[in-house]
Amino acid sequence: MTNIRKSHPLVKIINHSFIDLPTPPNISAWWNFGSLLGVCLILQILTGLFLAMHYTPDTMTAFSSVTHICRDVNYGWIIRYLHANGASMFFICLYMHVGRGMYYGSYTFSETWNIGIVLLFTVMATAFMGYVLPWGQMSFWGATVITNLLSAIPYIGADLVEWIWGGFSVDKATLTRFFAFHFILPFIISALAAVHLLFLHETGSNNPSGMVSDSDKIPFHPYYTIKDILGLLVLILTLMLLVLFSPDLLGDPDNYTPANPLSTPPHIKPEWYFLFAYAILRSIPNKLGGVLALVLSILILAIIPALHTSKQRGLMFRPLSQCLFWFLVADLLTLTWIGGQPVEHPFITIGQLASILYFSILLILMPISGIIENRLLKW
């Protein structure tokens, strides 16, 4: 009799994706982050669902409903902090996943890579809208400042901002629609993730060497399921340490003050995972230029495949490009730090230099190093 996992129409799909999937034998722990992102997404949807049962998307009661969740709902505090810190873990895994794709040349799978970029934008939009929902000071002013950036678009900017706000300022209509979008987008992300996997399984996974491994594959289960469970345990341990010991470590104290349109916080800033892009935005004194730089800081990932000049796929055997890659990582950490600092000397200059370096590495230095390394191969 045929095994049910190979004959049943539904189970067969799961079997081909997670059990009998032919996988390269040498993929490292850097390939764990895909499955961890799936776990983070499921966690966010589940905790978000329970939070939505008690949350009220109204400017008068939103802040007090979050307080009610933490104080009165049974285990509401842990659900709320799992959701808030789960978002941070989500972005850590997301940036690691993108970084691995850049390091090992996974961007040569163009369909998978492009769907991944769409996923990144969607997750960022979802996280931004989620940050607005508690209706604290930073929620309100963050929403005001970031949505107001769209007014830099010529001709339609002002109308577009009012259309998104649903009025002449961030108010009840804005909060209600942000809640609606924040609720529906994770399900769209789930669908996009399924398409992402579909395209990945068309080509098969890349591996650290960057060479084709079609002749030498092993089944995903049990080898990589065990490996993924180890990564999952590390993720759960880190998240629980964060939630149970320092739940507000990555948050902003200003968000414990109810939103007040008449009082501007001394320093408006987004969540830590957007600070690098926020620093790039602030480094350009022109509003439209800043908005373009902000969008390009993420959209630049789409042109990375076109800038690939090396004969080798990944950076495993390319020391010059490896140095540039780690310079880029250090630069992104610097930008994240600068994004959290006030707009004053010397932070302005450091931010501008770090922004120039960010675009220079990706657009100029990496392609040049690829050409140099090709020449070195001939020696």
Swiss-Prot record:
One of its GO terms (cellular component) is mitochondrial inner membrane. A ubiquinone binds at H201. Heme b b562 binds at H83, H182. Its cofactor is heme b. GO terms for biological process: mitochondrial electron transport, ubiquinol to cytochrome c. It comes from the Eukaryota. Keywords: Electron transport, Heme, Iron, Membrane, Metal-binding, Mitochondrion, Mitochondrion inner membrane, Respiratory chain, Transmembrane, Transmembrane helix, Transport, Ubiquinone. Heme b b566 binds at H97, H196. One of its GO terms (molecular function) is ubiquinol-cytochrome-c reductase activity. It is a multi-pass membrane protein. Binds 2 heme b groups non-covalently. It is found in: Mitochondrion inner membrane. The chain crosses the membrane at residues 33-53, 77-98, 113-133, 178-198, 226-246, 288-308, 320-340, 347-367. InterPro entries: Cyt_b/b6_C, Cyt_b/b6_C_sf, Cyt_b/b6_N, Cytb/b6-like_sf, Cytochrome_b, Cytochrome_b_C_euk/bac, Cytochrome_b_N_euk/bac, Di-haem_cyt_TM. Heme 1 (or BL or b562) is low-potential and absorbs at about 562 nm, and heme 2 (or BH or b566) is high-potential and absorbs at about 566 nm. The cytochrome bc1 complex contains 11 subunits: 3 respiratory subunits (MT-CYB, CYC1 and UQCRFS1), 2 core proteins (UQCRC1 and UQCRC2) and 6 low-molecular weight proteins (UQCRH/QCR6, UQCRB/QCR7, UQCRQ/QCR8, UQCR10/QCR9, UQCR11/QCR10 and a cleavage product of UQCRFS1). This cytochrome bc1 complex then forms a dimer. Component of the ubiquinol-cytochrome c reductase complex (complex III or cytochrome b-c1 complex) that is part of the mitochondrial respiratory chain. The b-c1 complex mediates electron transfer from ubiquinol to cytochrome c. Contributes to the generation of a proton gradient across the mitochondrial membrane that is then used for ATP synthesis. Belongs to the cytochrome b family. This is Cytochrome b. It comes from Panthera leo. The lineage of its organism: Eukaryota, Metazoa, Chordata, Craniata, Vertebrata.
